[in-house]
Amino acid sequence: MRNLFTALKQDTHANHDILENTFPFSIYHKDSLFDEKAYLAILKIMSMFHQASANAVQQAEFEVPALAAVASMINSGVIQDALNRDIIALTRDSLTEDTHATGTYTDQAYKDTHHNKPSMPYSSSPTSQAISAIYVWLGSSMGANIIVRRLNAMERDIPTNYYQAMAGCAKAWVSFKQEVEKLLPELDLENESFVADAVKDANAWFEYLISLADAEMHNNTSQAVEIS
């Protein structure tokens, strides 16, 4: 049987690359000037991802209490609070305009302007969806420290609460893998079928993020056309 994390890394590589090269995430590959609107778009997209994945993890934990140890590693309350503060700070300082950033950035605010919001990701099972969600969540935190340093080096007062909070999540990466490898035999999930399910669900989370990025850019384009 293939190791779960080897399979996840190898079999989600294509979608991971697509996501990194999808605007607005692609701005991190460039050493250009700070793009306020793209940065705000990233924060909004990640807010939607973190809300959806935290809900999936919470539901799975309710059904399988043994997941509690890994579920706590995403630190969802701290992450969402940091996102909300950054989104509000960006708009409050007039770096860019957004009519919804006067309070907590919620799913309802997204629905107000995103009529084609992507549907929730495919799920093979609550456990595989939760573990794959945490895999994508913590995996996305690995470069957070680098992003914070790059943003702080720019001659702008850029809010970085989100990436600072994610840098904290990155510290749980090794513990997460160890805990999952200990947990799977206990749940009788140490088999090829579960590995396949987890890979499928992880790819679904990546595709969800890509869809959120596409929807955000479509929404911004539509608003620009309406204004012009």
Where are each of the predicted segments found?
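Metal- and O2-centered redox machinery and metal/ROS homeostasis
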Residues: 1-228
